[in-house]
């Protein structure tokens, strides 16, 4: 007999996991529903493209991925460690730009400011994944993509990316 792995919580408008096995470390068990990682998924309902007006209407639902308290702590710790390092890296690049290139052509300075911003955001994503892998568990993205219910929704036309006009 097969049991349901998720249940709909109409009050919070989300699908909560009933499975207790952690998807991220494959060893732990989840104790509280709030330890789960809730992934927003989207389905485009209507798209309007007129010459001067664009509009997208979509549905959104959060699906819970079972996660133990240890994996939740690792994911939160990775985020807390990554952002200051990425910020320091971006500020270092900006200091380098201001010190060395501000006297030169303004286009070069603007391009290097964008490079610093990209390095900050990209560095944050890279470091978060690095710290998570170093702890020996799946990243949030890999855990979400490996969930069977998420896969079912993706095959039915839902997406992990929010639609934009």
Model-derived features with residue positions:
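Hydrophobic alpha-helical bundles in membrane proteins
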Residues: 106-109, 121-127
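Hydrophobic alpha-helical transmembrane segments
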Residues: 97-117
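A composition-biased, non-transmembrane "mature-region" signal
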Residues: 1-86, 123-165
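Hydrophobic H-region at the start of alpha-helical membrane spans
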Residues: 84-90, 111-116
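Hydrophobic, membrane-inserted alpha-helices
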Residues: 89-97
């Amino acid at each position: 007999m097969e049991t349901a792995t998720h249940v709909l919580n109409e009050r919070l408008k989300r699908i909560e996991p009933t499975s207790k096995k952690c998807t991220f470390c494959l060893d732990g068990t989840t104790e509280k529903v709030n330890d789960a990682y809730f992934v927003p998924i989207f389905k485009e309902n209507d798209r309007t493209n007129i010459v001067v007006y664009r509009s997208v209407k979509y549905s959104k639902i959060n699906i819970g991925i079972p996660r133990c308290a240890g994996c939740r702590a690792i994911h939160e710790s990775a985020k807390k460690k990554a952002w200051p390092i990425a910020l320091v890296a971006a500020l270092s690049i900006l200091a380098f730009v201001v010190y060395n290139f501000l006297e030169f052509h303004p286009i070069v300075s603007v391009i290097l400011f964008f490079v610093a911003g990209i390095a900050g955001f990209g560095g944050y994503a890279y470091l978060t994944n690095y710290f998570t892998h170093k702890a020996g568990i799946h990243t949030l993205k890999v855990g979400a993509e490996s969930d069977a219910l998420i896969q079912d929704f993706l095959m039915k036309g839902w997406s992990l990316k929010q639609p934009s006009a």
